[in-house]
Structures are given as C-alpha cells and as structure tokens.
Amino acid sequence: NKGLNPGMVVXLVVASFLLIFFVGNYALYXYAQKTLPPKKKKPVSKKKLKKEKLKQGVSAPGE
C-alpha cells in the first residue's frame, strides 16, 4: 500500500482546483458588487427583448 493511488490524487487535485475557482469567483463577484456602483438598467419591455433576440438570432445566454 503506497498511500493514495494516482487516480485519487488526480481527482483530489481537480476537485480542489474547482473549489478554489468557484470560491475565487464568488469572492470577486461579492467584492465587485460592493465596490462598483450599481448600474441602473432601463427597464426593457418583453416585446423589445423578443425583437432584439430575433434580430440577433439566438445570442449567448446571459447577455
């Protein structure tokens, strides 16, 4: 028994990287929310949204 097998090590490394990545993103997001002034968006009607989507084709979600 030589301690952990390589598969476990790889999985642990990947898992820890993902964890760090998500925690880092969350921290940055919270930090940005505090420091940046909130952008005031004009309310867009649903008809306009539909027209914009039709014009652009199907745009990336979250834009």
Curated annotation (Swiss-Prot):
The annotated regions of Basic residues compositional bias extend over 38-53
UniProt signal peptide: none
What is any one GO biological process for this UniProt entry? regulation of DNA-templated transcription
- Which GO cellular component terms are attached? nucleus
Mind listing the UniProt keywords for this protein, alphabetically? Answer: DNA-binding, Nucleus, Repressor, Transcription, Transcription regulation
Q: Which GO terms describe its molecular function?
A: DNA binding
Q: Where is this region: Disordered?
A: 38-63
Tell me where on the tree of life, at the top rank, the source sits.
Eukaryota
Q: What does this protein do?
A: DNA-binding protein that specifically recognizes a negative element (S1F) within the RPS1 promoter.
What family is reported?
Belongs to the S1FA transcription factor family.
Which protein are we looking at? Answer: DNA-binding protein S1FA
This chain's source organism reads Zea mays
